[in-house]
């Protein structure tokens, strides 16, 4: 599921109650991060090292 953030900060593609968040994905522990957007429910799910914009990425 690909989400996008509109001008008012909402998203048209995420289910109700979920926010479209920027998060960082690292395929390995190299310190190289790729930034993407996805819905809150999938922010910590996947085969990669993922941190939400409201979580570890803010440190």
Swiss-Prot record:
- Disulfide bond annotation, renumbered to this chain: 3-20, 14-39, 43-51, 52-57
Grouped into one coarse class, the protein's main location is secreted
Q: Where in the cell is it found?
A: Secreted
Sorted keywords for this record are: Acetylcholine receptor inhibiting toxin, Disulfide bond, Ion channel impairing toxin, Neurotoxin, Postsynaptic neurotoxin, Secreted, Toxin
- Which tissues and organs express this gene's product? Expressed by the venom gland.
GO MF, any single term: ion channel regulator activity
Keyword RNA-binding in record: no
List the GO cellular component terms: extracellular region
* InterPro entries attached to this UniProt entry: Snake_toxin-like_sf (IPR045860)
Q: Which Gene3D superfamilies match?
A: CD59 (2.10.60.10)
Q: Which domain of life is it from?
A: Eukaryota
Residues forming coiled coils: none
Question: What this chain does, per the record?
Answer: Neurotoxin. Blocks muscular nicotinic acetylcholine receptors (nAChR).
Give the UniProt family note. Belongs to the three-finger toxin family. Short-chain subfamily.
| Record protein name field | Frontoxin II
What species is this protein from?
Micrurus frontalis
